[in-house]
Amino acid sequence: MGKTEQIPATLQERYDEITGLTNQFCQQHLNEEYRDLCRRMAVKLCHKRPSPIATGKTNTWACGIVYSAGRVNFLFDKNQTLHMQADELCQYFDFNPKTGSTKSTAIMELLKCG
């Protein structure tokens, strides 16, 4: 599905890797709305100049993107129908919650959300 989002050619492979991870997580633990939101966030990050996703580990970006989507949608609120702990999310991507939160904060600042 990656090519339809008009990703810069130099970032297509990175985008595909990151969204492959976010897609898998959303399929296993969340839903299609989260999957689509994560994809849109990844597209926006690809279009930043310079794009921050050009460097760093893909699983770090994937974790940060899902964490950010979760923060703005109250995923970590146990009173919501769809919820989970930040620890669970970060563990899936093999990160501690502080790392996930830090990356999420950076992403939210870059995308001016939350």
Which role fits each region the language model picked out?
Residues 1-58, 70-114:
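Basic, alpha-helical nucleic-acid-binding regions used in initiation and control of genome expression
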Residues 61-68:
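Short, structured motif recognition centered on aromatic/hydrophobic residues
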